[in-house]
Amino acid sequence: MSDGRVNADPQQEENMVKPPVKRSLTLLIVTYFFLFFGSIASSLLAKYYFVYGGSSRWVSTWVQSAGFPLLLILIYFPHYVLKTTTRRPFTRFTLRHLIFSVLIGLVLGFNNFLFSWGTSYLPVSTSSLLLSTQLVFTLILSRIIVKQKITFSNLNCVVLLTLSSVLLALDSSKDKPSGLTKTKYFIGYVSTIGAGLLFALYLPVTEKLYRTVYCYAMVMEVQLVMEFAATVFATIGMACEGGFKEMVKEANHVFTKGPTFYWTFAILANVVTWQLSFAATSGMVYLTSGITGGICMTALLAMNVIGGVVAYGDVFGGVKIVSTVLCIWGFSSYTYGMYMKMKKEEKEKGEYSGVKTTEDSGEMEVEMGNVKDDVAAADDRA
């Protein structure tokens, strides 16, 4: 870990070169693809654990962050195996980065715990629609923390998605699973809203932190520390509940699908897909902005609703249909507004802005400033 001193010439770090636009857009598209797959798969697998006999919210919390060692591949392979960069891992990773990453990671761990409570009681479709309320908090907190401009485009999107959740709340009595008490349903409802609030805080705070990093690899390093802290939080909770011995007992005697399905799908697949989702979220926030990342995730919640209906037979009545349409409408209007503003700005500039570069040990590192600056600018002016 660096002591914070920078060896490269500061003037070199401000150099701009003509952009490899396709590379920038490709990274953004690939990141969203992994977010798409990871978000939907992790939500369905999280419910899979509870549907077939799993009962520990701490286990459900633990699997959401325990896959952090997978990030070591993205961090170490480029330098030591692929030899595509001379930048050593954790170069310029300062004490400030470490402290903030740990603190954010602990908040993320508690967020995961609240999500687990909500998932254990609510249908996938219901919890997904409730989580869309995070956009209200994300917009407000982004305005406070990173000075995000409130425009017609993002405000319209937030209003539509919030209305979607309000409609769902008014129809909640018809959505309560049979055998579930009103108290437990209320706990699940409040826990899910709380998880949305904390995740809304997570997005702009990480955006502010990512403004102090200079390449995509550093984003993964910050994410590694965050997920490690979240895993420590969950592991302590598991230890108080019986630890891994309880997992073995649950796999062999409680889980109705048997130990093979327990370890393969309820645990391993959950670990991988959750890590994919969180890593892609971080990449999306870094390349664009916290509010854009939140809107992209919220758009996927509509797919989670459909996934819950298909995979678990969740009730999909008129209110949920309207709520889902509002989610899609809100995201589509925001995306279109952002796209039109980007085209207008590109036309005014006459060409794409440059890709910011830095130099480390004589070799150039490319930071995806092109996409980040263009999308953020469009978001501010949409």
From Swiss-Prot:
Belongs to the purine permeases (TC 2.A.7.14) family. It is found in: Membrane. Signal peptide: none annotated. The keyword Thylakoid does not apply. One of its GO terms (biological process) is purine nucleobase transport. Keywords: Membrane, Transmembrane, Transmembrane helix, Transport. It holds the Pfam family PUNUT. InterPro entries: PUP_plant. This is Probable purine permease 4. The lineage of its organism: Eukaryota, Viridiplantae, Streptophyta, Embryophyta, Tracheophyta. The chain crosses the membrane at residues 25-45, 62-82, 98-118, 121-141, 150-170, 185-205, 224-244, 260-280, 291-311, 315-335. Residues 66-170 form the EamA domain. One of its GO terms (cellular component) is membrane. One of its GO terms (molecular function) is purine nucleoside transmembrane transporter activity. It is a multi-pass membrane protein. Its main location: membrane. Residues 345-364 are annotated as: Disordered. PANTHER family: OS09G0467300 PROTEIN-RELATED (PTHR31376), PURINE PERMEASE 4-RELATED (PTHR31376:SF3).
